[in-house]
Curated annotation (Swiss-Prot):
This is 4-hydroxy-2-oxovalerate aldolase 6. GO terms for biological process: catabolic process; L-leucine biosynthetic process. Residues 5-257 form the Pyruvate carboxyltransferase domain. The active site is at H17. The keyword DNA repair does not apply. It catalyses: (S)-4-hydroxy-2-oxopentanoate = acetaldehyde + pyruvate. InterPro entries: 2-IPM_HCS-like (IPR050073), 4OH_2_O-val_aldolase (IPR017629), Aldolase_TIM (IPR013785), DmpG_comm (IPR012425), DRE_TIM_HOA (IPR035685), PYR_CT (IPR000891). Belongs to the 4-hydroxy-2-oxovalerate aldolase family. Gene3D superfamilies: 1.10.8.60, Aldolase class I. GO terms for molecular function: 2-isopropylmalate synthase activity; 4-hydroxy-2-oxovalerate aldolase activity; manganese ion binding. It comes from the Bacteria. Its EC number is 4.1.3.39. The record marks R13 as: Transition state stabilizer.
Length: 339
């Protein structure tokens, strides 16, 4: 492989789910400074559900997106400051505000079958001169050809890159391979492809490696795997594998290891790992950020988290339906004869 990988860190966006969107701007600044010094190419900063994601439904943040982004911008020298926007949550006005604060790259995220709602936001980002990626979430929930058709739509709106986004950590290597190949078959040669993996089935590094072997150039990863569910692709082992494979990148392995162990792990109030709950996310194909919501419902209503997650998967809930987790817990308690 001769193409240089673009390593996109998501510790301070997807990782927000792991700490219930509670982190100080000071800690954001320290992590950004460490990532920047370690040579990552992009650093994504926002509430876990993107710009303006702080709410009762998704979970309020300890600070505003703007406070986090300002802290990041003040500690950035080389990396591309990035954010996430979900149309219907974040608005064009918020995208413009983020741009004024120094954000130069945005990932516009939709459910895997709803790319059409991203047209205006992608168009505005291009108008601002930003680097733009389309982010097709829960990519396991549709077929490879159907997903590729959605990727083609995002490309037509102006996306420079489109991601296979395994939000549920449900894809296996064949699933990743099929989707990347389907993208490559329909996307223009100049359009990049990205991979966003989760660790719920312990496959995030393997899936990311397979994606790169199939031509992916942008790889999402995070310090210590800090992210929703069992976490994202942990950046340290992925970079180690990239080194062993001889792939070109700009990241320094030891510096990333130090940042993961010294700065990120101490912030976690719940270990980010594969355990009985997070494995169930991947097994059931459930949106990884539902974990903390399901755990809260389990504690409140006395239903096993795994039982809740299996029912969430059976019903096919997608991002934005967090409020239904309580309804599911109540239904399960009623079926079990509880009051």
């Amino acid at each position: 492989m001769t193409t240089r990988l673009f390593i996109q860190d998501v510790t301070l966006r997807d990782g927000m789910h792991a700490v219930r969107h509670r982190i100080t701007p000071d800690d954001v600044g320290k992590i950004v400074a460490a990532l920047d010094a370690a040579g990552v190419d992009g650093i994504e900063v926002a509430h876990g559900d993107g710009l303006a994601g702080g709410s009762l439904n998704y979970g309020p943040g300890s600070n505003t997106d703007w406070e986090w982004i300002e802290a990041a911008a003040a500690n950035l020298t080389h990396a591309r400051l990035t954010t996430l926007l979900l149309p219907g949550i974040g608005t064009i006005a918020e995208l413009e505000h983020a741009f004024r604060l120094g954000v130069r790259s945005v990932r516009v995220a939709t459910h895997c079958t709803e790319a059409d709602v991203a047209a205006q936001h992608i168009g505005k980002a291009r108008e601002l001169g930003m680097d733009v990626s389309g982010f097709l979430m829960m990519s396991h929930m549709t077929t490879a050809p159907e997903l590729a058709a959605q990727a083609k739509l995002m490309e037509s709106y102006g996306a420079h890159c489109v991601y296979v986004t395994d939000s549920g950590g449900r894809l296996t290597m064949d699933g990743v391979r099929d989707r990347v190949r389907a993208y490559r078959d329909v996307l223009d040669e100049g359009t990049e492809i990205g991979i966003h993996a989760h660790e719920n089935l312990s496959l995030s590094v393997a899936n990311s490696v397979v994606a790169v072997e199939e031509g992916v150039t942008r790889v999402d990863a995070s310090l210590a795997g800090h992210g929703a569910g069992a976490g994202n692709c942990p950046i340290e082992p992925f970079i180690a594998v990239a080194d062993l494979q001889g792939w070109k990148h700009n990241s320094a392995l030891f510096a990333l290891q130090d940042a993961a162990d010294d700065l990120v792990r101490p912030l976690q109030d719940r270990p980010v790992r594969v355990d009985r709950e997070t494995l169930t996310l991947g097994y059931a194909g459930v949106y990884s950020s539902f974990l903390r919501h399901a755990e809260a419902a389990s504690q409140r209503y006395g239903i096993d988290v795994r039982t809740i997650l299996l029912e969430v998967g059976r019903r096919g809930l997608v991002g934005g339906q967090e409020d239904l987790i309580v309804d599911i817990a109540l239904d399960l308690r009623s079926r079990a004869g509880g009051n």
